[in-house]
């Protein structure tokens, strides 16, 4: 089911978490934040909306590292009911797409609920103080649209890196609903 994300709640603090990567390595929010901020992306392996953006997402995340913005991806789906999203498949997906950031599994779905995530992909861009500054889409080329790419998330997070604030105007992300237990 297609869902749009809510608007950005500017200044909302990032909820703390500690989750395991697909290979059982543990990460906490405090370990992940970069000098200028953190991009938290709720994604999964099977959603066609994620598949359509994953290449640009990974490239943008890599470029943002040079600006002091780190990235973490979190898989929130019930992988028992949706085995394509299980931790083993997450590892394969991360390797296939050359993730340069942790891909964590939210077994209890509590982190997704704490953040207010509703779909995959769902992006949360935080400044260095872990205050929400971006809750929008990756770019204008959702689901393979043609045309010149406008990297909205990248541009927003570059603004966050330089000013600490996100853009006032943001366009909601859309994607597959999170598969709740």
Question: Where do the protein language model's features map onto the residues?
Answer:
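Chalcogenol-based redox active-site neighborhoods
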Residues: 1-170, 176-181
């Amino acid at each position: 089911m297609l869902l749009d994300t809510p608007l950005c709640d500017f200044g909302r603090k990032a909820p703390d978490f500690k989750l395991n990567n697909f290979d059982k390595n543990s990460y906490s929010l405090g370990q992940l934040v970069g000098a200028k901020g953190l991009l938290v992306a709720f994604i999964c392996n099977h959603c066609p909306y994620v598949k359509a953006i994953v290449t640009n997402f990974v490239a943008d995340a890599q470029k943002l590292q040079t600006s002091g913005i780190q990235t973490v991806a979190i898989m929130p789906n019930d992988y028992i009911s949706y085995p394509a999203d299980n931790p083993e498949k997450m590892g394969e997906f991360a390797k296939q797409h050359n993730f340069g950031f942790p891909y964590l599994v939210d077994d209890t779905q509590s982190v997704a609920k704490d953040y207010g995530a509703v779909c995959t992909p769902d992006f949360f861009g935080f400044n260095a103080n872990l205050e929400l500054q971006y809750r929008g889409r990756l770019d204008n080329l959702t689901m393979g649209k043609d045309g010149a790419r406008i990297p909205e998330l990248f541009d927003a997070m570059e603004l966050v890196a330089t000013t600490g604030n996100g853009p006032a105007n943001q366009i909601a992300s859309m994607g597959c609903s999170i598969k709740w237990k």
